[in-house]
Amino acid sequence: MATLIFVDKDNEEPGRRLASKDGLKLGTGVKALDGKLQVSTPRVGKVFNAPAVPKASRKALGTVNRVAEKPMKTGKPLQPKQPTLTGKKITEKSTKTQSSVPAPDDAYPEIEKFFPFNPLDFESFDLPEEHQISLLPLNGVPLMTLNEERGLEKLLHLGPPSPLKTPFLSWESDPLYSPPSALSTLDVELPPVCYDADI
């Protein structure tokens, strides 16, 4: 079904008043009254003392539109009224603002007592000057900590690292290289396997 478009002068522009499909089915009529177009709908039920002149139709968001148009007409943004200040009040305010700012000499004295913390200081390891690690190609080598000094000497005299000759470094207790007494404690008697039981 086609919709009807009417011109409405209340909105200050060629607005659109759409007649709904239900209104067209009920037989709504359009009446001109004092240059304004009004839509009248049939009333259902009893009507007591019906007015002779129909009321103007209510516009949606009418007050919002009016408020938005007022600043546009003046062309200036609205500013709140500021009370006029005398010379004494201005000087009092300026002295208050100057006294609230601390002097630059005594600002933050606790910064001088601050000890800087650098986490890289805990990652550095000291080596004696006679050992030169700069000759070794150490790219890709993980950080290793050796408990014994002789392990460090072995590492420095190995030469360039190669995948074929890797020295054994005991990082943890390895059961293959542990003494036989430790292996004997690990042997436990297990019960005999029973194959006859149905599972």
UniProtKB/Swiss-Prot annotation:
Where is it localised? Answer: Cytoplasm; Nucleus
Where, by residue number, is the motif TEK-box 2? 91-93
For this UniProt entry, what's an example GO CC term? axoneme
Q: Can the keyword Ion transport be found in this entry's annotation?
A: no
**What GO biological process terms are annotated to this protein in UniProt?**
cell division; chromosome segregation; DNA repair; homologous chromosome segregation; mitotic sister chromatid cohesion; negative regulation of cell population proliferation; regulation of cell growth; smoothened signaling pathway
Question: Which portions of the chain have biased composition (kind: Basic and acidic residues)?
Answer: 7-20
Q: N-acetylalanine: which positions carry it?
A: 2
**Modification comment:** Phosphorylated at Ser-162 by CDC2 during mitosis. Phosphorylated in vitro by ds-DNA kinase.
Tell me the superkingdom of the source: Eukaryota
Q: Where are the stretches annotated Disordered?
A: 1-20, 68-105
Enumerate the InterPro entries for this protein: Securin_separation_inhibitor (IPR006940)
Motif TEK-box 1, chain ranges: 68-70
Where is this protein primarily located?
cytoplasm
Please indicate the residue ranges that the annotation assigns to the motif D-box.
58-61
**Domain text from the record?**
The N-terminal destruction box (D-box) acts as a recognition signal for degradation via the ubiquitin-proteasome pathway. The TEK-boxes are required for 'Lys-11'-linked ubiquitination and facilitate the transfer of the first ubiquitin and ubiquitin chain nucleation. TEK-boxes may direct a catalytically competent orientation of the UBE2C/UBCH10-ubiquitin thioester with the acceptor lysine residue.
Subunit: Interacts with RPS10 and DNAJA1. Interacts with the caspase-like ESPL1, and prevents its protease activity probably by covering its active site. Interacts with p53/TP53 and blocks its activity probably by blocking its binding to DNA. Interacts with the Ku 70 kDa subunit of ds-DNA kinase. Interacts with PTTG1IP.
Which family does the entry's similarity section mention?
Belongs to the securin family.
> What this chain does, per the record?
Regulatory protein, which plays a central role in chromosome stability, in the p53/TP53 pathway, and DNA repair. Probably acts by blocking the action of key proteins. During the mitosis, it blocks Separase/ESPL1 function, preventing the proteolysis of the cohesin complex and the subsequent segregation of the chromosomes. At the onset of anaphase, it is ubiquitinated, conducting to its destruction and to the liberation of ESPL1. Its function is however not limited to a blocking activity, since it is required to activate ESPL1.
Protein name, entry field: Securin
According to its UniProt entry, this protein's organism is Mus musculus (Mouse)
**Gene behind this chain?**
Pttg1
